[in-house]
């Protein structure tokens, strides 16, 4: 079985979701992953000191390069440097349209566009103020259940209403609800929907031997 996933937003949340799907690929389930990104992520203005496993003071490009290399070792992903302007269709038959006129088909969509206001057509009615970021003009998507904006479309990262772009649920020193964690939750929710039962994926030391 092969499922297509469009990820709108290629910063830490979007790439974390792509990495989850890459690791979950097996003989029974494969993925076509397309990541759209405008290149305007807030992470580009940050240096990361509070997340384990990243080099101290890691910058956005260093983080992106590392995650993309990890993804590429398991799955070929298509990256498109473009803004998504509209979504049409329904779960299992979406079309994601970008500003260049490209239309990508997808079974599922993850929206990880950060906290700036989204003007993606068909999602306008779901945009609400982001109440956990103490800055003006910050927004997220109204969602329910497992970060479902509407059937087949999931919010991740700041767009899901969490308060930090990078830090994970690793204790009181970091935010419990976070971009990478919410992205993996969205990916787990999609995997569960595909399999028809609550599903997660973890490797063991011998999984890939």
Briefly describe each language-model feature range.
Residues 1-7, 75-82, 100-109, 113, ...:
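Glycine/serine-rich loop-strand microenvironments at binding/catalytic pocket rims
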Residues 5-62:
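Beta1-alpha1 glycine-rich phosphate/pyrophosphate-binding loop at the start
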Residues 14, 116-119, 162:
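Glycine-rich nucleotide phosphate-binding loop and flanking beta-alpha elements
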Residues 25, 152, 156-207:
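A conserved FAD-binding loop/helix module that cradles the flavin
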Residues 40-43, 101, 144-147:
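Short secondary-structure boundary/capping segments
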Residues 46-103:
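N-terminal Rossmann-like dinucleotide/flavin-binding domain of flavoprotein oxidoreductases
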Residues 107-138:
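Glycine-rich beta-alpha-beta "Rossmann" dinucleotide-binding loop(s) and their flanking helix/strand
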Residues 132-153:
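FAD-binding beta-loop-beta segment adjacent to the flavin cofactor pocket
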């Amino acid at each position: 079985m092969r499922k297509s996933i469009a990820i709108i937003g290629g910063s830490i949340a979007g790439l974390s979701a792509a990495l989850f799907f890459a690791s979950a690929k097996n003989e029974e389930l494969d993925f076509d992953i397309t990541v759209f990104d405008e290149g305007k992520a807030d992470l580009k203005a940050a240096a990361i000191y509070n997340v384990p496993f990243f080099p101290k003071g890691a910058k956005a490009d260093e983080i992106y390069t590392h995650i993309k290399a990890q993804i590429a070792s398991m799955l070929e992903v298509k990256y498109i440097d473009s803004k998504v302007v509209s979504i049409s269709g329904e779960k299992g038959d979406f079309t994601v349209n970008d500003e260049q006129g490209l239309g990508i088909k997808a079974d599922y969509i993850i929206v990880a566009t950060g906290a700036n206001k989204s003007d993606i057509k068909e999602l306008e009615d779901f945009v609400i103020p982001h109440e956990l970021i103490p800055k003006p003009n910050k927004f997220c998507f109204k969602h329910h259940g497992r970060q479902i904006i509407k059937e087949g479309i999931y919010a991740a990262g700041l767009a899901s209403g969490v308060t930090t772009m990078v830090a994970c649920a690793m204790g009181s020193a970091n935010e419990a609800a976070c971009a990478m964690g919410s992205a993996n939750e969205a990916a787990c929710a999609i995997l569960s929907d595909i399999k028809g039962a609550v599903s997660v994926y973890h490797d063991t030391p011998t999984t890939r031997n």
